C-alpha cells in the first residue's frame, strides 16, 4: 500500500501540476491579472475540501466518486469528441464509472475496507453498497458503462476508436487480477 500511495501521489502531483496551466487560462478568461489570486483560491478550495471531508465524509466520498467517474471518462475519451453537449457529459460519466464499479465487482470487501480507511462510518452507505452488490446492480452499471464505450467506438469510427475497448478491457483485467489499490495505481 505504501508503494501504491507513493506512486499515486508522485504521479498525481505531476498530473496536478498541469492545474497551473488551467489556472492561467481561467485567469485570462476572467481577466484576472494577478496569478497569486489563482493559487490562493486553489489552496483555499483544497483546505475547504479537507475540512468538508472531515465533517461529512460519506457525502464527500460520494461527490468524489461522481466527479472521478466524470473526470476519468472525459480524460480517456475527449480525443474522440468534437463538441461538448449534455449527452457527452453523461457518456463521460458512464464510461468513467467503470473505474469505480470494477473494484466493487471483483473485490467488494477489500474496496469497502478502503472506504473505511477514508473515515466512512455510515452504515446506511454500506447497506446501500451491499444491496447493489447482492442484487447485481453493479453488473447492470458495468453493462451501461460498456454501452457507452460501444457508442464512442461506433460514433465517427476511426481506427483510434479501438483504444476505447483497450481501455475498457484493461480496466476489467487489472481489477480482476489485482487488488483495488494496485489496479488503480497501474491504471493511473
Residue spans of the language-model regions?
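Short aromatic-rich membrane-water interface segments that cap or initiate transmembrane helices
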Residues: 123-137
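Multi-pass membrane catalytic core of lipid/isoprenoid biosynthesis enzymes
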Residues: 32-56
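Membrane-interface helix-boundary motifs at transmembrane edges
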Residues: 24-34, 78-90, 151-165
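Alpha-helical transmembrane segments of multi-pass integral membrane proteins
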Residues: 69, 75, 91-111, 134-152, ...
Amino acid at each position: 500500500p505504501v508503494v501504491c500511495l507513493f506512486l499515486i501521489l508522485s504521479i498525481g502531483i505531476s498530473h496536478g501540476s498541469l492545474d497551473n496551466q488551467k489556472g492561467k487560462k481561467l485567469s485570462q478568461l476572467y481577466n484576472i491579472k494577478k496569478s497569486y489570486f489563482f493559487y490562493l483560491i486553489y489552496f483555499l478550495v483544497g483546505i475547504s475540501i479537507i475540512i468538508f471531508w472531515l465533517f461529512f465524509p460519506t457525502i464527500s466520498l460520494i461527490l468524489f466518486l461522481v466527479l472521478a467517474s466524470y473526470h476519468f471518462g472525459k480524460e480517456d475519451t475527449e480525443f474522440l469528441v468534437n463538441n461538448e453537449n449534455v449527452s457527452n457529459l453523461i457518456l463521460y460519466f458512464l464510461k468513467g464509472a467503470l473505474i469505480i464499479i470494477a473494484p466493487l465487482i471483483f473485490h467488494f470487501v477489500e474496496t469497502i475496507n478502503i472506504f473505511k480507511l477514508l473515515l466512512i462510518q455510515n452504515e446506511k452507505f454500506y447497506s446501500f453498497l451491499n444491496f447493489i452488490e447482492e442484487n447485481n446492480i453493479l453488473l447492470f452499471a458495468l453493462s451501461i458503462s460498456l454501452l457507452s464505450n460501444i457508442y464512442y467506438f461506433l460514433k465517427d469510427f476511426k481506427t483510434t476508436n479501438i483504444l476505447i475497448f483497450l481501455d475498457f478491457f484493461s480496466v476489467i483485467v487489472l481489477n480482476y487480477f489485482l487488488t483495488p489499490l494496485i489496479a488503480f495505481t497501474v491504471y493511473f
